[in-house]
Each structure stands twice: as C-alpha cells, then as structure tokens.
C-alpha cells in the first residue's frame, strides 16, 4: 500500500490545522470549565494520537489536488485542517493511492478522518457524519467513442473502467447485465487506458470525471447520470460518540459559507442540488 505522510509542523509551511488558537481559547488543556472538558473529550476521541490524521488520495477535488506549484486543495484536505483548528491539534496529511486504501486506513486506525461517499457498504466499516455534498455519478468517454448516451453503456463488449475498490465498482458490478466492469489501480492509469482505447468509458462521480477529462484530449462526460454520491465525514468505528460534534461542525461550515469556499477553491464540479 502506497502511503505518504505530511506533518503540519510549527515551522516552515504552517497548515491551517496548526494555526494559533483563537484569542481566548488558549493552548490545549490550558482552559478550564465545561467547554474545555468537552473539547478535551472531543480531541481524545477524534485525535487520540495528539494529531489529527487526515486520509487523502490525489486526483479528486473531494480529496486532494496538487497543482504545478505544489499548492494543495481539496475537500478532505481543507476540512481536515479546519477540524484540526477546532480541536487545537496539529494535522497530519496521510496520502494514499486511491479511495479504497483511505477506507482501509480508517479501518486500521491509521487515519482519523476523511471525506468520502457515505455508501451503505462503507457504513458497515466506518461511521459517517450527516452528508455535506451530493455529487452526480456519470461516465467519461474518449474521443470517437461508440458510447453516445448513458443508455448505450450497458451493452455487450463495452468496457467500463472504475477505480479498484470504489463504490462504483460494487454498484455497477451488480447493475450491469452486459457491459464489463474493469477495475483500475489509479486515475492516472484510467486516463492512459482511455487514450489507448483500452476502455470505452470510465465511471465515477462527476467531480472526478471533470478532472479526468482535463487530462484526456477529446474526452467528454455523457449527459445524464446513473446515480448520486453523498459525501460525508468518515471516522473509524468505535468513535461514534463524536458524531454529534462532527455534525455540528459540518452544519456550521455549510451555514457560514466556509464549505462553499472550500468547494470553489477545489474547483469541484458535478454537484447536485440538495
């Protein structure tokens, strides 16, 4: 399993999660009273190692994007840092190759949070906050593809790529009657296979499809959708006592416009109306 660890330190490029505590809050453990006790309990549950470990994977604006200058954006990336600021703990960004590995990291208690599709299958192995964002699920097809509409996809001989271990792999594997589901190891591999004519389509949420389309000349996203994803904050099983606090955190981000700003910075496309 490929994994990279980025630690938000107190020197150099300081992450939001490591910014000084707001005036009046003080350093962790310095305040007294019920509010401080509640914060300490929340910190102990969500960041038991003393740092908030945020699981991400590259290529999706819902998780992590890195531009040519090294600037990092993404919903998981930024929300993790904002939660670290709330908890007054440093943030560690733990990078994986694909979303299934992030879920495995949560299951193994190697990371503390991520933002991902709150599918029924994943809810069996991790716990979720209330949904933050809804995304359309669709198909990306290469130039000169014989697939012209969503209805054309489920036909004999059609090869549909999905990220290995993703929700799309499970759902389409059950739904398709004729088309073949082809698991791929990464979005980079998917782009290469689309350009090489080894895939007739690639299926995932439209946020990722838009990013992928930018790297595959002539590729286009089919009109319509085959489903919806509901993105939420995921935490390891056994920490469900912190879900009310996570829901409050998420609702505040939605209410004050912070989540909308994070979505804009990530260039997240393909969102669905609530």
Regions found by a protein language model. Give the residues of each.
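Short loop->beta-strand "edge-of-pocket" segments that line small-molecule binding or catalytic clefts
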Residues: 51-56, 151-168, 180
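Short helix-initiation/N-cap motifs at beta->coil->alpha
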Residues: 93-104, 148, 182-192, 196, ...
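Periplasmic-binding protein-like
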Residues: 58, 133-144, 206, 210-251, ...
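C-terminal motif of bacterial Sec signal peptides marking the signal peptidase cleavage site
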Residues: 14-17
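Acidic, polar ligand-binding/catalytic clefts
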Residues: 81, 85, 90-154, 220-225
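Alpha-to-beta junction loops
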Residues: 53, 89-90, 107-116, 158-159, ...
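Extended ligand-binding regions for polar small-molecule ligands
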Residues: 19-21, 27-37, 74-86, 151-159, ...
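Extracytoplasmic small-molecule ligand-binding "clamshell" domains
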Residues: 26-117, 265
């Amino acid at each position: 399993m490929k994994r990279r660890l980025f630690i938000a330190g107190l020197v150099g490029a300081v992450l939001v999660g490591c910014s000084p505590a707001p005036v009046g809050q003080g350093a962790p453990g310095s305040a007294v009273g019920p509010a401080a006790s509640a914060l300490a309990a929340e910190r102990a549950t969500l960041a038991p190692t003393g740092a908030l470990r945020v699981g991400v994977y590259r290529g999706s604006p819902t998780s992590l994007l890195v531009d040519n200058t090294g600037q990092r954006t993404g919903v998981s990336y930024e929300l993790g840092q904002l939660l670290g600021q709330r908890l007054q703990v440093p943030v560690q960004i733990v990078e994986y190759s694909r979303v299934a590995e992030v879920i495995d990291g949560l299951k193994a208690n190697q990371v503390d949070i991520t933002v991902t599709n709150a599918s029924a299958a994943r809810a069996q192995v991790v716990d979720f906050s209330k949904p933050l964002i809804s995304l359309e699920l669709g198909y990306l097809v290469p130039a000169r593809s014989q697939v012209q509409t969503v209805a054309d996809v489920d036909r004999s001989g059609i090869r549909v790529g999905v990220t290995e271990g993703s929700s799309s792999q499970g759902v389409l594997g059950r739904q398709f009657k004729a088309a073949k589901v082809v698991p791929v190891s990464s979005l980079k591999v998917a782009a290469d296979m689309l350009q090489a004519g080894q895939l007739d389509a690639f299926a995932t949420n439209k946020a990722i499809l838009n990013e992928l389309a930018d790297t595959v000349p002539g590729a286009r996203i089919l009109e319509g959708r085959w489903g919806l994803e509901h993105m939420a904050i995921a935490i390891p099983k056994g920490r469900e006592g912190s879900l009310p606090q996570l829901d409050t955190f998420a609702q505040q981000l939605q209410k004050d416009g912070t989540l909308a700003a994070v979505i804009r910075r990530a260039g997240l496309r393909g969102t669905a109306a609530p």
